[in-house]
């Protein structure tokens, strides 16, 4: 693929120009039947294996689904190379050009006092909920009760934030975490 392009672009769904964009758009249209929004279909094809990948359609209102056409743009193939490298390593690896970052960042004690709140939909097909669980457990080995994990049933990846019911289902949870005091032992 990198012989013909350095990126993939969901915007091809609005009018592909060139042989590769047309071929990929036709392939995605033929294999993704979840909706009539070709940009939405391309996003699913680019970012994962789901139908759809980044959200559950029942959580999107028609206006948001239409708005998605303008929200996604070029994705460099270097992103996929980094993801493949990370999968092979079993943890996130530094991206090309930032080799000064430690290779074993996930295997050492965090160099921060930041509190992390992991939030994902159980139906997330972009980054599986299991990855959030593993990250939470890895950080919790160093500070029990400091970080939080929320796996939201029925949600996917971005519908946690874009979903029509997110203001009632998810945002109160985010506010509660933002307002949650730090444990006494960490101040």
Where are these regions (language model features)?
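Alpha/beta-hydrolase-fold enzymes
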Residues: 1-98
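Soluble or luminal CAZymes and related metallo-dependent hydrolases
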Residues: 75, 79, 131, 166-170
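Conserved beta-strand elements of beta-rich interaction domains across eukaryotes
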Residues: 87, 123-124, 156
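The feature captures the conserved acid-bearing segment of alpha/beta-hydrolase catalytic domains
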Residues: 100-113
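Short beta-strand/loop motif that positions the catalytic acidic residue
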Residues: 112, 118-120, 124
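Conserved alpha/beta-hydrolase "acid-adjacent" motif
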Residues: 125-134
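Catalytic active-site module of serine/aspartate enzymes centered on a nucleophile-bearing elbow/loop
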Residues: 136-137, 142-187
């Amino acid at each position: 693929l990198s012989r013909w392009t350095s990126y993939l672009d969901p915007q091809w769904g609005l009018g592909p120009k060139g042989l590769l964009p047309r071929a990929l758009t036709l392939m995605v249209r033929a294999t993704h039947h979840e909706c009539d929004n070709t940009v939405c279909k391309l996003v699913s094809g680019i970012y994962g294996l789901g139908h759809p990948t980044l959200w559950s359609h029942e959580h999107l209102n028609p206006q948001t689904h239409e708005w998605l056409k303008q929200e996604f743009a070029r994705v460099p193939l270097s992103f996929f190379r980094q993801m493949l490298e990370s999968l092979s390593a079993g943890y996130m690896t530094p991206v090309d050009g930032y080799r000064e970052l430690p290779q074993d960042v996930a295997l050492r004690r965090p160099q921060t006092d930041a509190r992390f709140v992991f939030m994902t939909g159980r139906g997330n097909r972009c980054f599986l909920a299991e990855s959030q669980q593993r990250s939470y457990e890895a950080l919790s080995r160093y500070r029990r009760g400091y970080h939080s994990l929320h796996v939201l049933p029925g949600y996917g990846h971005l519908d946690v934030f874009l979903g029509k019911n997110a203001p009632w289902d998810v945002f109160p949870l985010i506010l509660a975490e933002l307002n949650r005091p730090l444990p006494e032992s960490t101040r």
